[in-house]
Amino acid sequence: MSDVTTAEFNEEGKYLRKVRSFVLREGRLTKGQAQAMEQQWPIMGLDYTPESIDLVEVFGREADTVLEIGFGMGASLVAMAKASPELNFIGIEVHKPGVGACLAEAAEAGVTNLRVYHHDAIEVLENSIAEGSLACVQLFFPDPWHKTRHHKRRIVQAPFAELIRSKLKVGGVFHLATDWENYSEHMLEVMNAAPGYKNQSATGDVVERPDHRPLTKFEARGHRLGHGVWDLMFERV
């Protein structure tokens, strides 16, 4: 079990770590996940430190870096890393079974351009990622907190948009996706109001799913049931 934190901010836009009144029961790691954590973490794992990491040192090369917040079980992240060996990928996930599953899949796929954090994403972004160092930040299917009284817990808020902007290089892209239409509207409102961004949609709203974002099994099932998915892409200018 681990405490669950939520991205809340004060009036000045300062991130506040707040612990909700329940704990998340993560479930036990499978044998394969535990083995991957033991064998692959020394290779692909990044231990959190409160100072900026050197991406060239971490990956052993200079290349554009893509960072994904909350990669779940990691299947799509591994697929993207395998499809784009010229890019560096960093994934951040708080659920240990997901980290183990991602490491196992990455090892099986022979991926070498992926590193992962098992830590709070906001803390990693604030303290470990240098300003202007990322080519892309991906936030796919974050918790929608669909009840109105919980909307303040949504990770996409004005201070979060500014935090991401500060980590992107000029020309870098913040790519968001959600299967909740109300959350897509919230995302669009926040991002359109955020300074230093340009919406990549020709119509000023959402974009078609780009080929580089794999269609997940969950998403494919949603399409069959008539559920929508909304992608937003904003460029740092």
UniProtKB/Swiss-Prot annotation:
Alphabetical list of Gene3D superfamilies matching this protein: Vaccinia Virus protein VP39
Pathway: tRNA modification; N(7)-methylguanine-tRNA biosynthesis
UniProt keyword terms in alphabetical order: Methyltransferase, S-adenosyl-L-methionine, Transferase, tRNA processing
Stretches of the chain forming a coiled coil according to its record: none
A GO-annotated cellular component: tRNA methyltransferase complex
SUPFAM superfamilies the record matches: S-adenosyl-L-methionine-dependent methyltransferases (SSF53335)
Reactions catalysed according to its record: guanosine(46) in tRNA + S-adenosyl-L-methionine = N(7)-methylguanosine(46) in tRNA + S-adenosyl-L-homocysteine
Entry annotated with the keyword Methyltransferase: yes
Residues passing through the membrane, by range: none
EC number: 2.1.1.33
Domain of life: Bacteria
Positions of the catalytic residues: D143
Residues bound to substrate: K147, D179, T216, K217, F218, E219
Residues noted as binding S-adenosyl-L-methionine in the record, renumbered to the chain: E68, E93, D120, D143
A GO molecular function held by the record: tRNA (guanine(46)-N7)-methyltransferase activity
Similarity section: Belongs to the class I-like SAM-binding methyltransferase superfamily. TrmB family.
Function (record text): Catalyzes the formation of N(7)-methylguanine at position 46 (m7G46) in tRNA.
Stated name of the protein: tRNA (guanine-N(7)-)-methyltransferase
